[in-house]
């Protein structure tokens, strides 16, 4: 249904017609592969603080809405993965069942409906999960494939998996909607298992060399500083750099 609200809707636009709820649910998908400066490095133009502010505003000012964070899991996602998971937990508390109110919707009948005795079916809005996550594994470009990860980076993922397990949903989940669901934990378990399978050593060397070349060119073109943003990857970067140095030395001899 529509109605005119000249005080609160499009006050200065000249168009005051407001369309009331015409859908049962709206699902907003957000691509976010990390947090803070690392997330901004991976997606040029992203303002992380503004994104989170807008996300909270969207959740606070709308009903019948859900947000799903998509972390296209690549090697650059690893350092901030635990912080990313903590962000999910925090939002699930902030907008979870403890802060939701169940209510009944009974649309007002039109004059025509009143005349013909037509009654709308009442709808009862129950509490529901508003924050979802997904962590699909990136396979291309090859140099960002997490299967190129070193044992140190793999250990970081293992630590994050334990973090998820220690924050798994509890018996009151249907009331609070807090914690991680079993299938969400299985997603990271699956990713970790695939990453541990590894790749052919020659392919890993090629991918790491291309990683070094790509990052250097990326920083040059966009005036960024990889090691300042990803200090946790200093060792990995230097391993990749060593491959380039060997090639350069071979050319000189």
Located regions from the model:
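Radical SAM/AdoMet-radical enzyme domain recognition
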Residues: 1-115, 128-136
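Polar/charged alpha-helical tracts
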Residues: 7-11, 53, 60, 90, ...
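Generic preference for hydrophobic/aromatic residues in regular secondary structure cores
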Residues: 26, 65, 105, 111-122, ...
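Charged, low-complexity, helix-prone segments enriched in Lys/Glu/Asp/Gln
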Residues: 29-31, 70, 156, 160, ...
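Active-site rim elements
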Residues: 38-44, 68-72, 141-148, 181, ...
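Flexible glycine/acidic-rich beta-alpha junction loops that bind and position SAM and/or redox cofactors
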Residues: 73-79, 96-161, 175, 179-188
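Radical SAM enzyme core and accessory elements
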Residues: 165-253
